[in-house]
């Protein structure tokens, strides 16, 4: 079981488009001034995946070589619910998890990011245990495999979603860390929506302490950078451009400059597309000068 070490330089990017081929997400990253990107490796709203061909894999790896982008993150599909109480949904989710991981290994991707799951009409405790079981099934894929880290993304706490507290994510990490390479991706909008105040350096330091106590900072492997259209603790997952929401730009300046967070890869998911991301990347980089 191999794990990529943390990067030696700050990495910043956005969720770019795979329209016309997976490699185009990499080239779009270069165009917006990114050093990394997040992408979908398959249609995020369908159960079925198109099989990877050798040509597609080679085109993707060529794009990585030509651009020098690294620590690429794949965002798994939205239909996947590893903790589903419905047996049919659970089985489909487990098949998709295996296929997603296999494709990421073939492509040489560093991170594969999953929404933890939803309890639906069951308890969160039972949901968490099913998530552990779902990801335990892929342990054989990581024997003698290229490095790949499974990330669980923080959620906004809406509905029956699990993963809105560090304690819930800590439970998953603790149960899985000796089986597969695992970590956490903090979405700034999501944790703000779930009640974690990150509007100032002081509040961020407290949140990072809480994370360390519940999970361990070594498992914080990535950030999704998003401002929030709604106030603290409203459990609304609505992204806003950086500095134009209720979180504020001071929060993102902290992440770019603090010793604990500056080297952790960061991926923009703000609404606005490539033109906005180019500006946001330029502004975020300016904080480190």
Curated annotation (Swiss-Prot):
Cofactor(s) needed by this chain: Zn(2+)
Top-level taxon in the UniProt lineage: Bacteria
Disulfide bonds: none
Binding site for Zn(2+) 1: 75, 115, 153
Chain positions recorded as Zn(2+) 3 binding sites: 190, 237, 239
Cofactor binding, note field: Binds 3 Zn(2+) ions.
Enzyme class: hydrolase
Reactions catalysed, as given in the entry: Endonucleolytic cleavage to 5'-phosphooligonucleotide end-products
Keyword Nuclease in record: yes
Biological process annotations from GO: base-excision repair
Family annotation (InterPro entries): AP_endonuc_2 (IPR001719), AP_endonuc_F2_Zn_BS (IPR018246), Xyl_isomerase-like_sf (IPR036237), Xyl_isomerase-like_TIM-brl (IPR013022)
Keyword Hydrolase: yes
Keywords: DNA damage, DNA repair, Endonuclease, Hydrolase, Metal-binding, Nuclease, Zinc
GO molecular function, one term: DNA-(apurinic or apyrimidinic site) endonuclease activity
EC number assigned by the record: 3.1.21.2
Residues binding Zn(2+) 2, per UniProt: 153, 187, 224, 269
Similarity comment text for this entry: Belongs to the AP endonuclease 2 family.
Biological role: Endonuclease IV plays a role in DNA repair. It cleaves phosphodiester bonds at apurinic or apyrimidinic (AP) sites, generating a 3'-hydroxyl group and a 5'-terminal sugar phosphate.
Stated name of the protein: Probable endonuclease 4
Protein source organism: Chlamydia abortus (strain DSM 27085 / S26/3)
Lineage of producing organism: Bacteria, Pseudomonadati, Chlamydiota, Chlamydiia, Chlamydiales
